[in-house]
Amino acid sequence: MTEPTFPRRPQAIFLMGPTASGKTVLAMALHQHLPVEIISVDSALIYRGMDIGTAKPGADELARAPHRLIDIRDPAEAYSAADFRRDALKEMAEITEAGRIPLLVGGTMLYFKALLEGLSPLPSADPEVRARIEREAETVGWQALHRQLQQIDPIAANRIHPNDPQRLLRALEVFFVSGNTLTELTKISGEALAYRVHQFAIVPLDRALLHQRIAQRFHQMLAAGFEHEVSTLFARGDLHREMPSIRCVGYRQMWSYLADETDYDDMVFRGICATRQLAKRQMTWLRGWHDVHWLDSDEPAALDRVLQVVSA
């Protein structure tokens, strides 16, 4: 009796790493050596008009290797992990059907997790419900809404700080829209990714070197016109500091400076510190990641290592 044969799952490559670790440089090199198409996995690169502070690939880089899922939202618009998973799966299918390999590059680890493991069946954002919650917050304050969440979903309330309006808003919204708590819904597992995924994490082994690069990059952004970029957003009038776009590292600190809440030197210091904290959180995610190949961003053989694994 002939054994049944099953179609081999298509390949995909994850290239993960903290900010300023050299992901883009390696991705560009891989684009030259492999039949790959790059998909950005970055919650900041999705926004139009936010180029300098996000270290978005330049026009020359994009001409040589186009990146999908960048510049797809206005800074006033929301974009969730569920939105990313939907869009990424669509892009991956198109790339695979063209006989090429999706190369997913970035540092938004929640997006990678959502794509790899699937998502719990959480409801989509509801503008009317959100507006109602925000109006209530203006009246009674977020502390009172946190106490309300403590009654509805104590487990989520214990995880969410009273001064984190974005997560607090989402937890309440989920309950009011679905009738189920965030804790209940997140226990339901999602659909795993139907690809053979080669996972790589690129990091500088010397933490001091990473910190040096972060500071250097921040100063380069300032020299490139970061203040003007944020002042353009600031002047629009429809954006505020609690929006996900303005909460991006660097933008929030520059926003405070433009609002005359801090001086220039303090803004620079806080921006660099916030970027270092982001890198630390990204590294914490990566240390708990399974089946990942570690790459030293300062090792010239990193490219060869990826090529060897993917070609095996």
UniProtKB/Swiss-Prot annotation:
MF terms in GO: ATP binding; tRNA dimethylallyltransferase activity
Enzyme class: transferase
Recorded catalytic activity of this chain's protein: adenosine(37) in tRNA + dimethylallyl diphosphate = N(6)-dimethylallyladenosine(37) in tRNA + diphosphate
Keyword terms, alphabetized: ATP-binding, Magnesium, Nucleotide-binding, Transferase, tRNA processing
Family affiliation: Belongs to the IPP transferase family.
Subunit description: Monomer.
UniProt protein name: tRNA dimethylallyltransferase
Organism placement in taxonomy: Bacteria, Pseudomonadati, Pseudomonadota, Gammaproteobacteria, Enterobacterales
